[in-house]
């Protein structure tokens, strides 16, 4: 069995921070690090337009931070490898994105992401931050027919980011964006296929 290295990693314990720092350095005209594990647009749009925010674990780069930019996401909140970011970090991002037009939080249907999003939105509501959630559940391999709630949010989020981001740039309201997103969710399905299991860069364990 080959022992050829397939990853360039300085320190497995610091991999997420280095991934995001490297990405921000590589594309300074597109993104910047606003805080630890929070990636935002280098040139933000006005507060009169809805901010599009998402969250998820690292380890899938350039997703999800690679979709931050004009006409797409305004902010990506990143967790550890294959793990959701904590509610406090997401709440910090919502505070940074707070604006009159409101925030649309796009949440991929994974238990950790959903839990963090629910808690962060509760904290935001107490602070008077205008935010609404949109849950994506496109992966039909995890839930067939009526079991929509069992479906994971996967690659179907990418066109959604573009559609919502472009609509937000045009000045669509938060309610209009929710309507667009819900219509999209009803008409998209993806199927996850993998050639082999992946390995965790920090502990080397196999993930199936």
What are these regions (language model features)?
Residues 76-81, 125-150:
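Short, acidic/small-residue loops that bind anionic groups at enzyme active sites
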Residues 1-52, 206-208:
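N-terminal amphipathic/basic leader segments beginning at the initiator methionine
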Residues 57-62, 108-117, 152-157:
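Gly/Ser/Thr-rich loops at beta-strand to alpha-helix junctions
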Residues 114-128:
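Short Gly/Thr/Asp-enriched flexible loops that form oxyanion-binding sites at enzyme active sites
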Residues 142-151, 161-208:
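Internal, active-site/partner-interface "lid" segment
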Residues 2-4, 47-55, 64-77, 141-144:
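Gly-rich Lys/Arg/Thr-decorated short loops/hinges at beta-loop-alpha junctions or inter-strand turns
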Residues 60, 67-100:
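Glycine-rich oxoanion-binding loops at beta->alpha junctions
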């Amino acid at each position: 069995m080959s022992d050829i290295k397939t990853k360039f990693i300085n320190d497995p314990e610091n991999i997420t921070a280095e991934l995001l720092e490297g990405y921000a350095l590589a594309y300074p005209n597109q993104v910047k690090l606003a805080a630890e594990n929070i990636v935002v647009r280098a040139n933000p749009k006005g507060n009169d337009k809805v901010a599009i925010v998402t969250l998820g674990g690292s380890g899938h780069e350039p997703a999800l931070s690679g979709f931050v930019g004009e006409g797409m996401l305004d902010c990506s909140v990143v967790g550890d490898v294959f793990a959701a970011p904590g509610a406090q970090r997401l709440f910090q991002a919502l505070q940074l994105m707070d604006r009159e037009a409101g925030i649309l939080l796009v949440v991929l249907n994974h238990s950790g992401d959903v839990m963090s999003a629910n808690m962060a939105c509760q904290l935001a509501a107490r602070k008077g931050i205008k935010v609404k959630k949109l849950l994506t559940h496109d992966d039909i391999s995890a839930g067939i027919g009526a079991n929509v709630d069992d479906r994971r949010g996967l690659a179907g989020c990418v066109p959604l980011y573009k559609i919502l981001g472009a609509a937000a740039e045009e000045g669509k309201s938060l309610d209009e964006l929710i309507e667009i997103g819900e219509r999209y969710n009803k008409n998209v399905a993806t199927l996850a296929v993998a050639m082999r299991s992946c390995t965790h860069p920090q502990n080397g364990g196999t993930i199936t």
